[in-house]
């Protein structure tokens, strides 16, 4: 496995390589990331994993400075999974100008759900992913469903900007108690970690109610948010949306997703549950 730090070196490697599957990450890899890598390995012999903590997708007061940087440990895990290349550029390599002069602006989605609470986040995601797509030139790229809104943004930009890349969604990795795997779980105290699976349970409860012909979407959303608030969470949102577009759900929609974001102590957690109705 090679660890490559420059765009020029990666492009030289890419010239003589066939099909490539790509997994973009910010490092501090856990089992959820490795599940993406394993899916990528099924799709192509050559897998590239990027490790880059992208300043553009962090807002003021967020955890950019304390986000864990664990390149050597990550590289060891990826080597064991048969990854061909780790692309680990520094900030000046990916953003040679003091500021990124041109950005990819997602449409309405960047101001809804998580975008409402993290201004500029999805612009940062869309911009860095577009840059990485242009650098790596993958045939396939794998993204986790835990970041459901991010996945929708990536699907949209891939289609609208004519990237010839197959986007592969991968199911959310979970701990035994249901908590979605996340690099930020390490911020949780022991007590918070014990409480954290409640988020998934509340979303599951909403999903079950929807399957029982529960069309009072606002009531179900409010009930789940109230349960979380009563347990000490600070809720950003619980919302039921169309799974394909993340537009507001309406009666008659068959494929839905229940999404939530909430803070437990100082840690912001997100999760979602897909729902298929008959």
From Swiss-Prot:
Compartment annotation: Cytoplasm
Function, as annotated: Catalyzes the condensation of pantoate with beta-alanine in an ATP-dependent reaction via a pantoyl-adenylate intermediate.
Family: Belongs to the pantothenate synthetase family.
One of the protein's GO biological processes: pantothenate biosynthetic process
Binding annotation for ATP: 26-33, 144-147, 173, 181-184
Record: active site: 33
Note: The reaction proceeds by a bi uni uni bi ping pong mechanism.
Record-listed (R)-pantoate binding positions: 57, 150
Residues the record lists as binding beta-alanine: 57
Catalytic class of the enzyme: ligase
Sorted UniProt keywords: ATP-binding, Cytoplasm, Ligase, Nucleotide-binding, Pantothenate biosynthesis
The keyword Phosphoprotein is assigned to this record: no
PANTHER family in the record: CYTIDYLATE KINASE/PANTOATE-BETA-ALANINE LIGASE, PANTOATE--BETA-ALANINE LIGASE
Pfam family, one: Pantoate_ligase
Descriptive protein name: Pantothenate synthetase
Any one GO molecular-function label of the UniProt entry: pantoate-beta-alanine ligase activity
E.C. numbers: 6.3.2.1
Main localisation: cytoplasm
Listed pathway(s): Cofactor biosynthesis; (R)-pantothenate biosynthesis; (R)-pantothenate from (R)-pantoate and beta-alanine: step 1/1
InterPro entries the UniProt entry points to: Cyt_trans-like, Pantoate_ligase, Pantoate_ligase_C, Rossmann-like_a/b/a_fold
NCBIfam families, per the entry: cyt_tran_rel, panC
GO CC annotations on file: cytosol
């Amino acid at each position: 496995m090679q660890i490559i730090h420059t765009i020029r070196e990666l492009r030289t490697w890419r010239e003589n390589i066939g099909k490539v599957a790509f997994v973009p990450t910010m490092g501090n890899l856990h089992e959820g990331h490795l599940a993406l890598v394993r899916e990528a390995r099924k799709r192509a012999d050559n897998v590239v994993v990027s490790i880059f903590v992208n300043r553009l997708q962090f807002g003021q007061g967020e955890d950019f400075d304390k986000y864990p940087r664990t390149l050597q440990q990550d590289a060891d895990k990826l080597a064991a999974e048969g990854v061909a290349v780790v692309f680990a550029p520094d900030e000046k390599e990916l953003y040679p100008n003091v500021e990124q002069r041109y950005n990819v602006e997602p449409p309405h989605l960047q101001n809804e759900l998580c975008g409402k609470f993290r201004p500029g986040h999805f612009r940062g995601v869309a911009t860095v992913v577009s840059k990485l797509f242009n650098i790596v030139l993958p045939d396939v790229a794998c993204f986790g469903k835990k970041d459901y809104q991010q996945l929708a943004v990536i699907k949209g930009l891939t289609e609208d900007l004519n990237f010839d890349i197959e986007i592969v969604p991968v199911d959310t990795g979970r701990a035994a108690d249901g908590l979605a795997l996340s690099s930020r779980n390490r911020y949780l105290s022991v007590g918070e970690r014990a409480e954290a699976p409640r988020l998934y349970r509340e979303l599951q409860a909403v999903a079950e109610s929807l399957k029982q012909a529960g069309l009072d979407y606002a009531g179900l959303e409010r009930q789940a948010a109230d349960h979380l608030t009563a347990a000490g969470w600070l809720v950003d949102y619980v919302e039921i949306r169309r799974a394909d577009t993340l537009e507001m759900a309406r009666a008659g929609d068959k494929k839905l997703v229940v999404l939530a974001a909430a803070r437990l102590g100082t840690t912001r957690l997100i999760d979602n549950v897909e729902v298929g109705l008959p």
